[in-house]
Amino acid sequence: MPELFEEITSNVKLLYSSTPIPAYEKYIGSYLCSGEKNAIIDPGPKTAIPGLVRVIKEVGLQPEQIDYVILTHIHIDHAGGTGTALNLLKNAQVVVHQRGVKHLIDPAALTKGSIDTLGELVSKYGEIEPVQADRIVTGEDGTTIDLGILKLQIVLTPGHAAHHLSVFEPAQGVLFSGDTAGIFHNGLLRLTTPPPFRLRETLESLDKITALNPKIICYGHLGGYGDAKNRINEFRKLLLRWYDYAQTRAKQGQSFTGVVDEFINKEPELNVYFATLDKDARKRDYSQLTNSVTGLMTANA
């Protein structure tokens, strides 16, 4: 039987919803924070919701015991299933950046933007269903989600997206970074810099989460790891190095995919990593890398 969840701390679990898309089974997941109340961070796309509910039950909770669904941002792979989830998590409120509120209520523009960026993958993620306005709570800097023994702090972290926020649990030093500090998947740190990418805002957000002095970082893709501040710093160095190279090649007229191929060939760890991938995983990661490189090449500092 496949692993359904992983304990990060005694109060935090990574839930594998097993999104039924080849190579995405453990690329997308959610975090469960439990005290007297319970919160899910990033429910994932619509096709992940049946698996998410199954794992919630597996850890000993009922769907009605989820009090909050917190969205680090509204991109379809993190939040596309929110409306679907709320039909099952009947007592939950949604916490989201103020810029994301209107897109939860009316997801038409979000759906179009997702199709424009991701193409056929959107149909595999599933329809983005609307969320009722009275179930939405706006997350601001300083907003605290009180779960009893756990107090989750909202920290606005634009850069990856204008509507991005992170979540910090100070008692254990756990940071839920969404896509602010990159992807750490299959042992490799990678960029998450889709267009329209904002370098200055991203660097400011990295400073902001570093100042929290986190001990554990929980990536949106995927898992919880110690030595959080060093990991954030490693992402900063990777980001600046790739940004400078991508900007230079953009001015020289190189194509997006041309720069992607250059990165794969010139970065030893990336080259070895891509050589190990099967067809589906390579398609997933090549697409993600192309999206990130496009953001770097078209960014304004």
Task: Briefly describe each language-model feature range.
Residues 50-99:
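Active-site metal-binding motif and surrounding structural segment of the metallo-beta-lactamase
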Residues 203-254:
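Divalent-metal (often Zn2+) His-rich catalytic cores of metallo-beta-lactamase-fold enzymes
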Residues 41-44, 67-73, 95-97, 157-159, ...:
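Active-site neighborhood of phospho(di)ester-bond hydrolases with catalytic His/Asp-centered motifs
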Residues 248-301:
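C-terminal regulatory/interaction regions
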Residues 104-155, 203-210:
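Metallo-beta-lactamase
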Residues 165-220, 230, 297:
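Metal-dependent phosphodiesterase/nuclease catalytic metal-binding core
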Residues 32-33, 142-169:
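Core dinuclear metal-dependent hydrolase active-site scaffold
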Residues 2-59, 167-177:
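Conserved beta-strand hairpin/beta-sheet module of binuclear metal-dependent hydrolase folds
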